[in-house]
Each structure stands twice: as C-alpha cells, then as structure tokens.
C-alpha cells in the first residue's frame, strides 16, 4: 500500500474528475456552476453528520456538546449563504448559455437540502425544549 498523502487521503484523482460539463464546447461558467453545487452537496452531507451528533448529544443529556455542534452548524450555514456571492458572479446570459443542457435538473431536487432544512428546524425545536426544561421555563415547551 502506498504511503498516505494529501491527494490519496482525499481521493483527489477521483474528486477532480467529477465535474462533467454538458455543453459542447464547454461554457466557461458551467464549471463554476457544477463546483458550487457539488460543494453545496458536500456541506449538506457534513450538516447531516453534525445533526446526527446533536441528536446523540441530546439523547445522552450532553447539552454543552450539542451547543458546540450547533455553533458549527451555524458556521457551515454562513458558508453556504456566502457561496451565493460566488454564484452571483455568473451573469444571466452566461447561465442561459448552458441551462438548456441541464434539462429538468434543478437544485430544488436536492434531497439532502430538504433533509437538512427539516433537521435544522427539528433540532432547533428540540434544543429550545431541552434548554427551557433545564432552565425551568414552562412557556417555551407548551
């Protein structure tokens, strides 16, 4: 087995071949579009991983661990929002130059995005309920 390197630990050889523009010839901004959306999906995967930890921490009564992980989730969400700034550097005409090749594909089809939104709202409600109970606040839990 070869020694562990940055490239083989991250499987960069495979990762960097996953961007497959459909336009011919390739439209320049299509690569940006693909990478932004693949990055979103990777962050969604990480958020799901973090929500699992929050759930485990709550179930075990580790409120401080859950709070720490919530802070990480918040930071990841800030990154997701900031990525919109990069996407907005693409002009409408640039996007329309390859949009038809995407056929019916849309970011609204992201299952991970919907699961993250659902878990974020459920985790927040669970956090409020547990924190309120720990503080003896009944109004927040009724």
Enumerate the language-model features and the residues they cover.
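Surface-exposed peri-terminal alpha-helical interaction modules
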Residues: 1-142
């Amino acid at each position: 087995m070869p020694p562990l390197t940055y490239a083989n630990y991250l499987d960069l050889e495979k990762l960097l071949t996953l961007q497959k523009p459909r336009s011919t010839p390739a439209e320049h901004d299509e690569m940006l579009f693909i990478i932004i959306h693949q990055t979103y999906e990777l962050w969604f995967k990480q958020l799901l991983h973090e929500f699992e930890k929050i759930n485990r921490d709550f179930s075990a009564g580790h409120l401080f661990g859950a709070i720490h992980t919530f802070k990480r989730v918040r930071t990841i969400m800030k990154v997701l929002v900031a990525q919109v700034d990069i996407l907005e550097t693409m002009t409408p005409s640039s996007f329309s130059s390859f949009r038809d090749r995407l056929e019916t594909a849309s970011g609204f089809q992201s299952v991970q995005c919907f699961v993250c939104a659902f878990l974020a709202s459920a985790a927040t409600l669970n956090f409020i309920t547990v924190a309120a109970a720990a503080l003896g606040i009944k109004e927040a839990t009724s």
